[in-house]
Amino acid sequence: MQDVVDAMYGVVNEGGTGAPAALPGIELCGKTGTAQLASLDKSKAEAARHGMNLKENAWFVGFAPRRDPEIVVVALFDHGGVGQYAATIVRDVVKSYFDKKTRLQTWNQERSTTVAGISFLRPPTAESRTR
């Protein structure tokens, strides 16, 4: 299993097709892919008659952090063509998750107080709720 995790890490962080998903400070691992549309040639001909441009579906699955993952995200981008486009969507979701986690940890640390070795959270103030 570790070989698979290492390979997925490389896809994102070592110049692989998932490089657009890389995030500084977060070990995101992932895999790009495409899914061929059924009868793509026939569909393209039909789409061209209607002024549409059909491409293969693109997907990306990613998880973070590399060790002890907390989040898994899959993005499927209809007619995206290549998985790199879906990788940027996953990157943004993972970044939002860790940004929010950091804000919550900071907020809780600011509210905590310790009495006799026991940690308590003070009730939030109106000011602290606006952050």
Feature roles, as predicted:
Residues 5-104:
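Active-site beta-strand/loop architecture of penicillin-binding DD-peptidases
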